[in-house]
Amino acid sequence: MKKSLNNSSMWDVKPIKLSILVPTRDTVHSHFAYCLTQLVRTTSEAGIDTYLFFDSNTILLNQREKLIEKAKEVRSDYVLWLDSDMMFPSTTALRLLEHNKDIVACNYMKRAKPLKTVAYTDLTNWDSWVPLEPKDELIKVEGVGMGCMLMKLNTFDKLQKPYFEFTYKEDSQDWYGEDFNLLKKLRDLGYDVLIDTILSMDIKHLVIYAFGSEN
């Protein structure tokens, strides 16, 4: 196992195989590309067997299903979901792995006003979003976006396909995304969905903004 400044005793116990899964369109943000290269380098130098899979398509449900199958093919222990419009520290995977939890994610801001985050403690109440505030302990939520989420691959073992679905909420006349639906299935199986609020402070959500005369 390669030694580096990023090495830790936790990696000496058992080599870990990590698949980084990224659903994309035709292009990715340059800031994301830079963060990703630094993350892969840092994670690999820590002795973790690191794989990177992209799926460039137009149907997000298909992308996520195919990416999980790629992770299974290489027999990953963990998967790190990243969206291609995110910025994150090079140590992101290491810091999430250190928790040794089934599901641990980062909270981050949505890309539209009113400014809210993507994590909720109660999926029946859209006002229950979790503010970006650092806490000493991991916090439990009912739902969070998958822009930066680490999962043990074996959490999928008890699930039936399709893993990812959209569902319509009649009461609020809107949709649950594939992220919230997956996490609900896993919560129903007894898994906790946890947020690293300290790491979340370093996560950015990229958007293209058009400057014009009104600015």
PLM region spans:
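Conserved catalytic core of nucleotide-sugar-dependent glycosyltransferases
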Residues: 68, 89-167
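N-proximal low-complexity "stem/linker" segments adjacent to membrane-targeting elements
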Residues: 1-57, 62
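Alpha-helical elements of Rossmann-like donor-binding domains used by nucleotide-donor carbohydrate transfer enzymes
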Residues: 35-38, 66, 95, 181
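Anion (oxyanion) recognition and catalysis
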Residues: 44, 97, 187
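Short beta-strand-to-loop acidic/aromatic patch adjacent to the donor-nucleotide binding site
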Residues: 76-87
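Active-site nucleotide-sugar/metal-binding loop of Leloir-type enzymes
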Residues: 65-78
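C-terminal catalytic/acceptor-binding lobe
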Residues: 2-15, 158-215
